[in-house]
Amino acid sequence: MAKTITISEEAYKLLLKEKRDGESFSDVIVRLIKGNRREVMDYAGIWSDMNDEESNKLFKDLEKMWERWNVNA
């Protein structure tokens, strides 16, 4: 069942740029939404080439950011 929606001119132009030959706007929207969904397991092993020093620095930096975030919350 088709539904009618209203989008801004800017949204229309952006969708038009993403649209491929033979693709409907519905197809574009579905492709873009599904393409942006990632599962946690998609990231498994992504940092496997990181050494211990780099890993420790990353987590220390993250802790600092989390502390700042908690203070501002």
UniProtKB/Swiss-Prot annotation:
Domain of life: Archaea
Keywords linked to the UniProt accession: Toxin-antitoxin system
Disulfide bond residue pairs: none
InterPro entries, A to Z: Put_antitoxin
Xref: Pfam families: VAPB_antitox
Sequence similarity: Belongs to the UPF0330 family.
Record's function text: Possibly the antitoxin component of a type II toxin-antitoxin (TA) system.
Protein name: Putative antitoxin M1627_0365
Organism of this sequence: Saccharolobus islandicus (strain M.16.27) (Sulfolobus islandicus)
